[in-house]
Design a protein with these regions (language model features):
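Active-site acidic/histidine proton-transfer and metal-coordination neighborhood
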Residues: 17, 60-140
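N-terminal pre-domain/capping segments
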Residues: 1-83
Length: 140
């Protein structure tokens, strides 16, 4: 599984493993790295770094809600995360999509200062049409 990373979310929330144990288990299973979910709240960054070292894998990316990205950037940089994906946002119109794009652009500039790239994880709602374009096109 040399080049395959695991999204920690894949373990689910009721698997009986703590957040740190999920990281260790991913390494034990042979994954090359992990994508974090925001279950790290309240866990000191050094504890996560230690779990990653024990597992022998990096935290390549993280899924972080739009409202938490800015505050989490310093923490994620400490962990060595290079990519942050906003997993979804509520928008139903072209205007709301443009507002999301502005937010993501602002966060992208801030994230760059930490060596992190921001992305957006789309779902089906982004393919609704407003003003003749898919909502996702307005975000892009």
């Amino acid at each position: 599984m040399n080049n395959v990373n695991l999204q920690i979310y894949s373990f689910g929330f009721d698997c009986g493993l703590s957040f740190l144990d999920k990281i260790r288990k991913a390494g034990e299973l042979g994954y090359a790295g992990v994508e974090l979910v925001r279950d790290y709240e309240g866990i000191p960054a050094q504890d996560v770094v230690n779990a990653l070292k024990e597992a022998g894998i990096p935290a390549v990316s993280a899924h972080v809600g739009l409202d938490f990205i800015e505050q989490d950037l310093p923490y994620l940089a400490e962990l060595g995360v290079k990519y942050v994906a906003c997993p979804m946002a509520a928008f139903n119109t072209a205007e709301e999509a443009k507002e999301l794009a502005a937010d993501l652009n602002r966060l992208g500039k801030l994230a760059k200062e930490y060596g992190i790239t921001i992305g957006y994880h789309n779902h089906t709602g982004e393919f609704y049409v407003d003003q003749g374009k898919y909502l996702l096109d307005w975000v892009m």
